Curated annotation (Swiss-Prot):
Belongs to the ABC transporter superfamily. ABCF family. ARE2 subfamily. One of its GO terms (cellular component) is cytoplasm. GO terms for molecular function: ATP binding; ATP hydrolysis activity; rRNA binding; tRNA binding. ATP 1 binds at G37, K38, N39, G40, A41, G42, K43, S44. This is Ribosome protection protein VmlR. Changing F237V: Still confers resistance to virginiamycin M, lincomycin and tiamycin. The gene is vmlR. It comes from Bacillus subtilis (strain 168). The antibiotic resistance domain (ARD) is packed between the 23S rRNA and the acceptor arm of the P-site tRNA and inserts into the peptidyltransferase center (PTC). The C-terminal extension (CTE) contacts the small ribosomal subunit, positioned in the Shine-Dalgarno-anti-Shine-Dalgarno cavity. One of its GO terms (biological process) is response to antibiotic. InterPro entries: AAA+_ATPase, ABC_tran_Xtn, ABC_transporter-like_ATP-bd, ABCF_EF3_subfamily, P-loop_NTPase, VmlR. Signal peptide: none annotated. Changing F237A: No longer confers resistance to virginiamycin M, still confers resistance to lincomycin and tiamycin. Binds within the E-site of the 70S ribosome, where it contacts ribosomal proteins L1, L5, L33-1, S7, S11, the 16 and 23S rRNAs and the acceptor arm of the P-site tRNA. Residues 5-200, 292-504 form the ABC transporter domain.
Amino acid sequence: MKEIVTLTNVSYEVKDQTVFKHVNASVQQGDIIGIIGKNGAGKSTLLHLIHNDLAPAQGQILRKDIKLALVEQETAAYSFADQTPAEKKLLEKWHVPLRDFHQLSGGEKLKARLAKGLSEDADLLLLDEPTNHLDEKSLQFLIQQLKHYNGTVILVSHDRYFLDEAATKIWSLEDQTLIEFKGNYSGYMKFREKKRLTQQREYEKQQKMVERIEAQMNGLASWSEKAHAQSTKKEGFKEYHRVKAKRTDAQIKSKQKRLEKELEKAKAEPVTPEYTVRFSIDTTHKTGKRFLEVQNVTKAFGERTLFKNANFTIQHGEKVAIIGPNGSGKTTLLNIILGQETAEGSVWVSPSANIGYLTQEVFDLPLEQTPEELFENETFKARGHVQNLMRHLGFTAAQWTEPIKHMSMGERVKIKLMAYILEEKDVLILDEPTNHLDLPSREQLEETLSQYSGTLLAVSHDRYFLEKTTNSKLVISNNGIEKQLNDVPSERNEREELRLKLETERQEVLGKLSFMTPNDKGYKELDQAFNELTKRIKELDHQDKKD
C-alpha cells in the first residue's frame, strides 16, 4: 500500500516536559488508525503535529502531496455558511437542524462539524474524539461512513466499541512512546497483555540469573578474603596462599565480566505498572424519600416541541439514565430540573438535596487558573488532601501549578469531577461524564458510581457505562418522557455482543496472517480459522436481516 505520512524519531515537549519521544510510525493509504492512551499522553497533540499545526521538538514528519482535514474535540464557534452539496446531504441524513450553532445539542454540534470534515474529500481525515455526544443511531452511521470513506482516517477515541468496529490499526501512546498494532482495540489489548507477560517472565528469568552469578561472586569474594588472610598468617605457606588468593581474584573478575556480558545481552526491563486511577465519592447528607417530582411538564422552542405532559418521580438513591436521540432534549431536561430553564408544568426538587452538576462544557472552567488557585485551601492538611486526590486521578506533581488551559480535555473533566468528590454531594447530575476520559478513568468512574449511595442522573451514549451505573431510565422519544426499569439484554443484543467478539478474534487472526506467508508453519490453521470466523459473522448478519 502507498505510504502517505511518515513519522521519524518525532519528539514533542511542553515547557521542558517531554510528552512523547522517538516516535516512529507510518500511515498507509486506506488505514483507519485509532490513537489510544491515557489523558495527557499527547493524542490530540499528535493529530495537530500530523496536521502541521505544531512542530516537533525533534525528528521529522513527511507528508506526501495530500489534502488534510481535522475535526477537533470541541469548538466554541461554527458556521453553516458555504455548505457543499455533500455536507448538506450528511446534515440531512443526521437530522441536524440549520439554526444558531449555540442552540444545538452537544450531539448536533458534533454532527455538524463531522459533516463538514467528511464532506471535504480529504486524503487524510483527522478526527479527535468523534463519538462524544453521539447517540447509538448516529454512532452506527459514523462507523459506516468511515468504513466506506474514500481516503485514510486517523482518529483519537476512548470508545471501546467504536475502536473495535472502525479501527484497522492501533497507535498506543504509552511510556512516552508509540506502539503500532495491526488490528482493532480488543486485538491490541490481548497482544499487549501477552507482551507484558512475556516481558515479565524474561525479567524474572534474568533476575534469577543475576542472583545466581552474584551468589557465586560473593562466595568467591569470601574465599579470596580467607586466602588473603591466610597468606599473611601461616608461616611457610604464605606463597601458596598468596597465589591462591590471586587466582581467586582472577575468577571473581572473570565472573564479573560474564555477568556484565549477560546483562548487556538480555537487558530485560521490569514491566511498567499499569496506569490506574482511584477516586471515591462519598455522601454524608441525610435526605428524605423523594428527590424529584415532575408533573405535566411541557417544553418547546417555538414550534418545535421537545416533550409534553411529562410525569415521573425519582426517589433518593435511584440511579437513572436519561436517554434519547441527539436533539431530543436530554440536557434541556437537566436544566429544567436545576431551574436553569423554564417549562410549563410543575417541577419539585427536594430542598435538602445537595446537588453537583457536571456539564458537557470543557470551556467553562477558569482556564488561566491553576489547580492550586482553583482549590485554594487555608490549611496544609486540606491542601495535601487535594494534591493526593490529583495524584490518584493520574495528574503529575507539576500540574498542581500548571494553568488549566494547558491540560487535555480529559484532564479538565477530571478537574471538574474533583470538585464533587471534595464536596461530598448527595445528588450527582452528570451530562456526558465519560466524554474525553481515558479508559482507566472511565472504568474507575463506573466502579465508583456503582457503589455511590446518593442519587444519580446521567446522560450518556456510552452503553457500557450506563449498564454498570444505572438501574432505571428516562426515555425521551416521540415528544414524551417514559420512565422504565433497565431491561434484560435482548437476544439481538446478545447476538451483537457475539458478533463483536468474533470480529475481534478475526482481526487478531488477520494481524498474525499479515506477518506470514503461505509456506510458514501454522499459516494453514490460521487461514482456516479466519474463514470459519468470517462464515459465523455472515450467519449472524443474515439473522439480523431476518429480524
